[in-house]
Amino acid sequence: MKQLLRIMILLLGLIWILAWAAAGRFDDTPSTQDGSESPLPSGEIAAPGERDSAKTLRIQIQGEVQEMDMGTYLLGVLRAEMPASFEEEALKAQAIAARTYTLYRIRGGGSANHPDADACDDHTCCKAYLNAEQAAANWGSMAVYYEEKLARAVSETDGEVILYDGAPILAVFFSSADGSTQGAGDVWMNDLPYLQKVDSPETEELVPNYYSVATFTAAEFKSLILAAKPDADLSGSPEGWIRDIVRNDSDYVASVTVGGVKLRGNDLRTILSLRSPSFTVEYKDNAFTFHVTGYGHGVGMSQYGANILAKQGLSAEEIVQHYFSNTTVGYYDG
């Protein structure tokens, strides 16, 4: 009887091995940058969790309102907003942040830009969104692997939200910091207790295109400034157009005076399409040259920073609590 039992166990093990081999499980599979993960077998797309499935949203996509559950929406956001090659814990952190941001906006009454929808696919208003077909065209041969990976990031954080005083926060994020983030009050009008300066681990070696340079002739600079700020006085020598650069304790430009008009650093970044408000500027040979560090407004969660922290072993929940001060991660049914 014992011999028969051993034979049956061996046969079951052989069947299991053959099934996995047929699914390509033992093939050389794509991995993250440190080669630490293995994907689910092809075709095993994680289903949205119970909490996300129970939340129906109205999303305006390319001008048309579509109904979908929270999990489906978040998967589309992840496809568009964070490199799928990133660590799984970073992708989970992104899913938590995007879910939180969406609930925060809904709780606040939505946007006048889309009164009939909870959110839209315009990243300047809400969050970018890609459907599976669009993402697959971008990913090529990695499409199945990446789709499975992002679906896991959503399903394994089902319903998780970043909370301050029991309510969803304004969970903003950006690409890469200059060594630290900056507080909301440094960029926008209102300071928020959970959007404060924190350290961020980016370096030139760890982030592609960490440094960038933007050059404008005096005529180009004048045209861009006057289009946005017609009251600026740029009649004198260009050497005197930019004055009084003030930096905050994160070393981002807090304010700068251009042609007599005081601007926030992030405003000048927007006007000139600079990658970040962390910059220096020099005028030489009738041109302004901006040396820029990082990418994005610098408030909230740095995506590249999140990926580096994930490589260092932090969980998604630890990552979001690092970037969003004084918060907890839990559920919100409001």
Region locations from a protein language model:
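Conserved, single-site charged/polar hotspot
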Residues: 1-334
